[in-house]
Curated annotation (Swiss-Prot):
Its EC number is 2.7.7.-, 2.7.7.108. The gene is ydiU. It holds the Pfam family SelO. Nucleotidyltransferase involved in the post-translational modification of proteins. It can catalyze the addition of adenosine monophosphate (AMP) or uridine monophosphate (UMP) to a protein, resulting in modifications known as AMPylation and UMPylation. It comes from the Bacteria. Mg(2+) binds at residues 255, 264. This is Protein nucleotidyltransferase YdiU.
Length: 491
């Protein structure tokens, strides 16, 4: 790779320049023996980065933060947050760095961020490092979410550092290169608010408006418009999580983005057997972030954002509170509409028309199918794929999944009367998701040096709606001996 190719890597520093109070210049830890494990070539091209360069020795060092382009200044970002309901006034990037910003092929500004790049001033007791398994988990799941059409941060690369990292055992270290619309979080606003620097809070909000919701700038109250936009984005996002059976696992306020992108995939999972109380994270002992609790927790987080933004919504705090409460009230309406409309589409009964999804008959069918799923602990993803076969006249696969055939048959008769669109169902209900047992299989193999299962899984989940020969095992639930699934964040 030529020097000319390297010179095309230009990173901006807008966040650090406009919000220097939230940015601490810092250097990544040197990796002793780096090795590129996986590179997202299409994403690299979208960002104007040469995949060949990124695969070179210098390019790999760039992905680790060990080779910083001229003019770039990596920074650790400061933020606060509520973690499992407990407030921490200072969290920040303890093991991560914002390398800078890139403009993508559509003219959007995107953050290039490293995870596992070493201790920063925010590290507290942590070692600042990450290990191969959790970084590849984020790569797999974030790219699967993108393929599902769900707003998410993206994964550009995972690089093994060549350093062993102590967790319960000694494990191979790694760095994830992550791409996002920004890394602004609810916790960013909480940190700015706790400084009692209203001018900083205003600059942060202006930065968020400029990057994510420029239409808010023209509103009578731009900051209220920003808040309403974040509420709407999160209502849509969480509904999309619920519709595919995604459990985030750690919905702290520092893990909720202003952009409406899913971020931080540490202890995430997808439900197999439908269970509203599903919890996979080892640290969520009380079930705070269980599958069915996710909309409630998102609303709770947004209330914390409103508290942080009160000085911007109205200079008179007493006047600001009812305005913020009214704006937050939009979340339940918007989430309910997105969930009901999405479920109707999963049933092949609506092509996105709100009036169709809102029909009482359709809503009754939505309620009925969730009852069938729950009562029989039915595989959530496979059920809807097989239901599309029933829409085409073959009900044997789906009937073979349910416990109460009489209840299903009564429900299905009413559903069939509405002439469900099987093609719409196939375009809406994925055949392939990152099933927990397949993710663990890929991570275990990769930790041992075998990347083939990882690449096969990525092949499946990168085109989730199109069934292909040879990928049948990727549509199936976990084997009986897989046992109870528990995830760990890897810190």
């Amino acid at each position: 790779m030529t020097a000319a190719a390297e010179s095309t890597v230009a990173l901006g520093g807008r966040f650090a320049r406009e919000l220097n109070e939230l940015a601490v210049p810092w250097e990544a830890e040197e990796a002793p023996d780096p090795k590129l494990l996986v590179l997202n070539g299409p994403l690299a091209a979208e960002l104007g980065l040469d995949p060949e360069y990124l695969s070179s020795e210098e390019g790999v060092r760039f992905l680790l933060g060990n080779h910083v382009p001229d003019g770039a200044t990596p920074v650790a970002q400061a933020y606060a947050g509520h973690q499992f309901g407990g407030y921490s006034p200072l969290l920040g990037d303890g093991r991560a760095l914002l390398l800078g910003e890139l403009q993508d092929s559509r003219g959007r500004l995107r953050d290039l961020h490293l995870k596992g790049s070493g201790r920063t001033p925010f590290a507290r007791a942590g070692d600042g490092r990450a290990v191969v398994g959790p970084m590849l988990r984020e790569y797999i799941v974030s790219e699967a979410m993108h393929a599902l059409g769900i707003p998410t941060t993206r994964s550009l690369a995972v690089v093994a550092t060549g350093r062993q990292v102590r967790r319960d055992d000694m494990l191979p270290g790694a760095v994830l290169a992550r791409v996002a619309g920004s890394h602004l979080r609810v916790g960013s606003f909480q940190y700015a608010r706790v400084t009692e620097n209203t001018e900083l809070l205003r600059r942060l909000a202006d930065h968020a408006i400029s990057r994510h919701y420029p239409e808010a700038a023209a509103a009578e109250n731009p900051y209220l418009a920003l808040y309403r936009a974040v509420v709407a984005a999160q209502a849509s996002l969480v509904a999309q999580w619920m519709l595919v059976g995604f459990v985030h696992g750690v919905m702290n306020t520092d893990n909720m983005t202003i952009s409406g992108e899913t971020i931080d995939y540490g202890p995430c999972a997808f439900i197999d057997a439908f269970n509203p109380a599903a919890v996979y994270s080892s640290i969520d002992v009380g079930g705070r972030y269980a599958y069915a609790n996710q909309p409630v927790m998102a609303e709770w987080n947004l209330a914390r954002l409103a508290e942080a933004m009160l000085p911007l919504i109205d200079e008179d705090q007493e006047a600001a509170v009812p305005v913020a409460v009214e704006a937050l009230g939009g979340f339940r309406r918007q989430y309910s509409a997105a969930w009901s409309g999405g479920m109707a589409t999963k049933l092949g009964l609506a092509a996105g028309e709100p009036e169709a999804a809102a029909g009482a008959e359709v809503q009754d069918l939505v309620d009925g199918v969730t009852g069938i799923l729950k009562d029989g602990s039915v595989d959530y993803t496979l059920f809807f794929r097989n239901l599309a076969k029933a829409a085409r006249g073959d009900s044997r696969p789906v009937r073979g999944m349910v416990m109460d055939l009489a209840a299903y048959d009564a429900w299905a008769e009413r559903w069939q009367d509405l002439a469900p669109d099987a093609g719409l169902m196939d375009r809406t209900n994925p055949a392939y998701i990152p099933r927990n047992h397949l993710v663990e299989e890929a991570l275990a193999a990769a930790t041992g040096g075998d990347l083939d299962p990882l690449h096969r899984l990525l092949e499946a989940v990168s085109a989730p709606y199109s069934e292909r020969p040879g990928l049948e095992r990727y549509t199936q639930g976990a084997p009986e001996d897989f046992g109870t699934y528990m995830t760990f964040c890897g810190t």
